[in-house]
Amino acid sequence: MTGLFVVLGCTIIFFLLAQILTPSSTYNPNNDSQRVKCSNKLEKRVYDALRFKVYYPTVQYKVPNKRFKLDFAFFAPNGLKIDVEIDGPFHRTPEGIKRDSRRDKYMKTNGWKVIRITDIALNNGFEKQILLLVAILNELGIEPSKETGFVMLEQE
């Protein structure tokens, strides 16, 4: 009987030590400086889904010499720049469509790949849209981070 208590005690001690010494690999949305930059709840949901899959987008990236910001920016190791936009109802209006068209043209001319996902598509099949986005990102050279000590450069 004493042996059982010794084994149980050692197991508990090793478990507690493992919890203390092992770095957490889980994403904590309440402790993320990029997440707070998301403009709305749907962007936060997309951001959370990407982070849970270990992708690190830059949120609200300010395009140099322009007045607009990108919902999510990714920079591939191969030099490709990727703009992921989450489009709400405004983007379906004639004014929004025209503005997005001009913006997309500018971005593509300046070396960016633009990916747009509508709120309708996300609301009708969120996980499917995230899986499609992840597949596109992988195809373009963006892969999940394998580093546990990932450092994000903050943009001013």
Predicted regions and their residues:
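Hydrophobic side chains within alpha-helical segments
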Residues: 46, 74, 103-107
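Solvent-exposed, charged helical/coil patches
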Residues: 1-57, 144-156
